């Protein structure tokens, strides 16, 4: 998120790295770690495009607004299944190319395939019989959904082995490990900013004029162009890293039993011995993600639909309004990423001043709740302005600034959400008798399961209240407020 998958790879990282530290004679030079970490920029570029542009694209293809969240189920499902599985098998990979490089290369190639399917879904669908004037382009939707799921699986195939490769290169050196992961986070921020900047540029398709076709309008052509840049960046940094950095072939030791316990078997076993502090952490984390997930999926759609008053299924003027809002929303996400990066650098100092991690988490959840609730005010102001100035009127500078301010402010609680829960899980694990990897694995379930619940639940809620994004944001605000209270009162 950006991002959503950065959290889902924690489980695989701990497990993969721990079994490979002895395979290298010593830590590798920092320049090699930076080369591997740079792959994160390519990965996150694609994730930024997913979060900012793909939900509106789904609706342009004709998927009803209330059902589009089901397509996003791939994120939590693949985070729950793919990353741990990839970690499990990469630990045991005996390829002459090394443990991690085969999975990283496979993930990059799958991303390329997925990008072609997603970007050309409308064209493929049209060539297979979809009518341009029909609101639902079923063949294009099927092709898009296939490409979308492949993209999520591919990104998950990349994330875990990349972080595990950094652990291998650090070879047990704690300082090098922290430095390598810091660079990985840095390149994630770089990818986010690049992705959101590309998504906010409305004339990108002019660089690739062939992207605009009879079945693919300007918005669709811009999406294609963004993904072409994304896959180019990813392939370049991946090829450089895999060529430059050696990944030694692994052979199991003769005296090793090479245990076959499934990864999830170990995670579920941790529930039997889990103590109260960990349960409280899981509750706060789950509530936190119930709050976050609707906004992370529908933030740019909210900007295009509620703030700008556009409609992805309306006439050309309404579509133009909607597209303008989407691109301003992408700018908001770029501001969000910048704030997130800045705040992340100061979390430790802020935590000390405010009185500890749980107080900091509780405080920023209040910010999250207020910001989500304020989307209602911004929406009502935009609707009032359109009633006075006309339905095609653009939002005033004040309304637009208010919406962008919410995007930026939400970078503060997002930075805490990406760090504090995992730090608390590590602290709790040291006194509970559970290993850090198991604790983080259980915490990961408290992230992806709420995402699935939200994916199934927000559609009916929206339909019950007449459609739009505000009902899900209000539910998120309530969940954030409850999460704040629980964090202040029951966290250790």
From Swiss-Prot:
Extracellular side: 55-68, 123-139, 203-224, 299-324, 381-403, 466-469
GO CC field: plasma membrane
Pathway: Glycan biosynthesis; sucrose metabolism
The UniProt record lists the keyword Oxidoreductase: no
Topological domains annotated Cytoplasmic: 1-33, 90-101, 161-181, 246-277, 346-359, 425-444, 491-492
Alphabetical GO biological process terms: sucrose metabolic process
Activity modulation notes: Inhibited by protonophores (e.g. carbonyl cyanide m-chlorophenyl-hydrazone (CCCP)), but not by SH group inhibitors (e.g. p-chloromercuribenzene sulphonic acid (PCMBS)).
Residue intervals passing through the bilayer: 34-54, 69-89, 102-122, 140-160, 182-202, 225-245, 278-298, 325-345, 360-380, 404-424, 445-465, 470-490
One Pfam family in the UniProt entry: MFS_2
Phosphoserine sites (modified residues): 17
Tissues in which the protein is found: Specifically expressed in flowers, along the transmitting tissue and at the funiculi.
Family matches, as Gene3D superfamilies: MFS general substrate transporter like domains
Principal location listed in the UniProt entry: membrane
Membrane topology: Multi-pass membrane protein
Catalytic reactions of this protein: sucrose(out) + H(+)(out) = sucrose(in) + H(+)(in)
InterPro entries for this protein: MFS_trans_sf (IPR036259), Suc_symporter_pln (IPR005989)
Subcellular localization: Cell membrane
Example GO molecular function: sucrose transmembrane transporter activity
Keywords: Cell membrane, Membrane, Phosphoprotein, Sugar transport, Symport, Transmembrane, Transmembrane helix, Transport
Physiological role: Responsible for the transport of sucrose into the cell, with the concomitant uptake of protons (symport system). Can also transport maltose at a lesser rate. May also transport biotin.
Family: Belongs to the glycoside-pentoside-hexuronide (GPH) cation symporter transporter (TC 2.A.2.4) family.
NCBIfam families per UniProt: GPH_sucrose
Protein name stated in the entry: Sucrose transport protein SUC8
């Amino acid at each position: 998120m950006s991002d959503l998958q950065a959290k889902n790879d924690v489980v695989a990282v701990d497990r993969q790295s721990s079994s490979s530290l002895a395979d290298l004679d010593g830590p590798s030079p920092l320049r090699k770690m930076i080369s591997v970490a740079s792959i994160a920029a390519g990965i996150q570029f694609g994730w930024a495009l997913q979060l900012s542009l793909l939900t509106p694209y789904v609706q342009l293809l004709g998927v009803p607004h209330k059902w589009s969240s089901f397509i996003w189920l791939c994120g939590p499902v693949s985070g729950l299944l793919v990353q741990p599985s990839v970690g499990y098998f990469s630990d045991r990979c005996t390829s002459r190319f090394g443990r991690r490089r085969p999975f990283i290369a496979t993930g990059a190639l799958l991303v390329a395939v997925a990008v072609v399917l997603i970007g050309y879904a409308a064209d493929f669908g049209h060539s297979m019989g979809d009518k341009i004037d029909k609101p639902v382009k079923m063949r294009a939707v099927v092709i898009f959904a296939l490409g979308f799921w492949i993209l999520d699986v591919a990104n998950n195939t990349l994330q875990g082995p990349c972080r595990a490769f950094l652990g291998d290169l650090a070879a047990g050196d704690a300082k090098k490990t922290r430095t390598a992961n810091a660079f990985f986070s840095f390149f994630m921020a770089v990818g986010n900013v690049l992705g959101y900047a590309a998504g906010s540029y409305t004339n990108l398709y002019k660089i690739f004029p062939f992207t605009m076709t009879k079945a693919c309008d300007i918005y669709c052509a811009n999406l294609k162009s963004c993904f072409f840049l994304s896959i180019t960046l990813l392939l370049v940094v991946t090829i450089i890293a895999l060529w430059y950095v050696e990944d030694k072939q692994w052979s199991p030791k003769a005296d090793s039993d090479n245990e076959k316990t499934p990864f999830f078997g170990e995670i579920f076993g941790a529930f039997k011995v889990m103590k109260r502090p960990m349960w409280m952490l899981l509750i706060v984390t789950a509530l936190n993600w119930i709050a976050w997930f609707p906004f992370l999926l529908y933030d740019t759609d909210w900007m295009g639909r509620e703030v700008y008053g556009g409609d992805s299924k309306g006439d050309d003027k309404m579509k133009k309004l909607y597209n303008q809002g989407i691109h301003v929303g992408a700018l908001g996400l770029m501001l969000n990423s910048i704030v997130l990066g800045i705040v992340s650098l100061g979390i430790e100092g802020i935590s000390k001043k405010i009185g500890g991690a749980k107080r900091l988490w509780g405080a920023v959840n209040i910010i999250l709740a207020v910001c989500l609730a304020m989307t209602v005010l911004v929406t009502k102001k935009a609707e009032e302005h359109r009633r006075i100035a006309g339905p095609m009127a653009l939002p005033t500078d004040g309304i637009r600034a208010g919406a962008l301010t919410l995007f930026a402010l939400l970078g503060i609680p997002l930075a805490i959400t990406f760090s504090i829960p995992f730090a608390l899980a590590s602290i709790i694990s040291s006194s509970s008798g559970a290993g850090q990897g198991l604790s983080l694995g259980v915490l990961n379930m408290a992230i992806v399961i709420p995402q699935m619940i939200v994916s199934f639940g927000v559609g009916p809620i929206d339909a019950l209240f007449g459609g739009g994004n505000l009902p899900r944001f209000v539910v998120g605000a309530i969940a954030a407020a409850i999460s704040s209270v629980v964090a202040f009162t029951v966290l250790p």
